[in-house]
């Protein structure tokens, strides 16, 4: 499924060749090369059948062809027919509803569903459980090594960056270099996406902290301006979300960028050695990408053009 809109009812009509060569290929590689313990079925239908109710997908392709030995679970509240899900080989229904239990019990009593199907599904769930460290007596510390995690994150961030073009801007000497830091994302980093992509982080190293840790000096006037602007914007958005049950899954929308005045730009140019601009986008569960996710807004264009023109005119980066 390539979309979040109407994801619970979307019916993807796909030819067998496109399904095999494009959509299933990544899953096939993952299953065959890594032998995962679990697989999750998606919300949508494929060619008229919910994926969680498709025996062709859950059993014929996944298990018989690819050799998957683990457990299949639904996405939360996925699918419509609990009995069909059992027959398909979707072993666990999440989060589990009374009506699903009742439908399965009724189907067993009427003979519509054979107990051997339930036995197979339960066996696969139990086989997964007995392999877990917890079942084998592992006692978690609830004290993760956050420093080690931070080192991995730092390495991933560096390796994941793409430098499109360098016109003499890099490298920059850090020690004592004064930086005019622009863009709301410079002061409010994005730790994760929306919905299940949200991250319960212990802390986030901001652009300011990163620069200062490296020896740069960040312009305090700009810092104070942005931090107040962002705090006020977030307070308004939190107030607007009060009473919305989805608020806990949705990080606050990014604030509109500040367009600096000509006078403030000149003051920043005089006080700083270089300018850094950070623009950010939020993405994740529940929402599809729109044109504005890829294109710069009017304020972003004005910000980039204004800052670059002012600093370049002064012979600065």
Predicted features along the sequence, with ranges:
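Glycoside hydrolase catalytic-domain context in secreted enzymes
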Residues: 1-317
